[in-house]
Regions:
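Extracellular/periplasmic, surface-exposed regions of secreted and cell-surface proteins
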Residues: 1-134
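Solvent-exposed, flexible loop/coil residues
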Residues: 2, 19, 47, 54-56, ...
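Glycine- and acidic
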Residues: 9, 62-64, 198-201, 210
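Active-site proximal loops enriched in glycine and acidic residues that flank catalytic Cys/His/Asp
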Residues: 41-44, 200, 228-234
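Conserved small-residue
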Residues: 67, 86-205, 247-248
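Extracytoplasmic gating/loop element in the C-terminal half of outer-membrane beta-barrel translocons
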Residues: 179-182, 233-249
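C-terminal substrate/ligand-recognition segments
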Residues: 206-236
Length: 249
């Protein structure tokens, strides 16, 4: 064997710095001699010239090339409430509650309408869809219809085998019809061609929560202080990468 070298990608001489424009509007309001402070804030952020891998012709010998092709926007609202519950000479107890709501959107991909990306944990299946007009964080995959039932099969009592009935869709590119068994995952044949393949994949979830926040309590006694913090998030789906990798059927 002889060592060799090859290019890992196509360089681009036209790359630019990513840029951001942000607008923040907020106000601080104090009550009861500043023992309660309420701080609402609205923000709008627009990012352009985002660096993304763009598809290139296969004749180049590569699949993608890094380019400035993306534009995104973020719009949201933050609310913070701080209260001084106890304030003595040697002891203070302060509480802070905050909640946030954010919505992001892909504004442009410079000619492209969408990209399909892998989760990058050693699994070659596309798991994310980056699409113009949609939020970042869309999960992409197959919709399930539950599990294959005994009624979906012809049973041969002589050799005690199950054979999937004709006309019932299955992943023909991954399994033979004789490999399918009751209890295996059954996926939605979205285009009705009786075959489960990449054309049946669709957006199945979104990682973005509806809102999220936290609650912090801080206690100070002379030269000592102690605090504890809780966080919460409501809405948004989670991609179970371990289950995705280890569950093939």
């Amino acid at each position: 064997l002889s060592p060799g070298y090859a290019t890992s990608g196509i360089p681009s001489a036209d790359l630019k710095w990513e840029s951001n424009k942000t607008l923040n509007v907020g106000i601080d309001m104090g009550f009861l001699e500043q023992r309660i402070i309420v701080s609402p804030e609205f923000y709008l952020n627009k990012s352009s010239n985002l660096l993304l891998n763009s598809r290139v012709p296969t004749s180049s010998g590569h699949k993608t090339m890094m380019r400035n092709i993306g534009k995104t926007s973020n719009i949201g609202f933050d609310l913070s409430i701080t209260s001084v519950n106890i304030q003595k000479k040697n002891f203070t107890w302060t509480t802070n509650f905050n909640v946030s709501h954010n919505r992001n959107k892909i504004e442009a991909l410079s000619g492209e309408q969408y990209f399909l990306e892998e989760a990058r944990f050693g699994y070659d299946q596309k798991t994310h869809k980056i699409e113009v007009g949609k939020p970042i964080g869309q999960f992409y995959g197959y919709k399930t219809l539950g599990l294959y039932q005994v009624e979906d099969f012809d049973y041969n009592a002589k050799d005690q085998t199950y054979t999937l009935k004709e006309g019932i869709p299955y992943m023909s590119g991954t399994f033979n019809r004789s490999d399918i068994r009751p209890g295996m995952w059954k996926f939605d044949d979205r285009n009705g061609d009786k075959v489960i393949d990449d054309s049946d994949m669709t957006v199945i979830g979104n990682a973005n929560p509806d809102f999220y926040g936290g609650l912090n309590n801080q206690f100070k006694y002379k030269g000592w202080d102690f605090s504890f913090f809780f966080t919460f998030s409501y809405g948004g789906e989670v991609l179970n990468a371990t289950k995705l990798t280890n569950t093939k059927t």
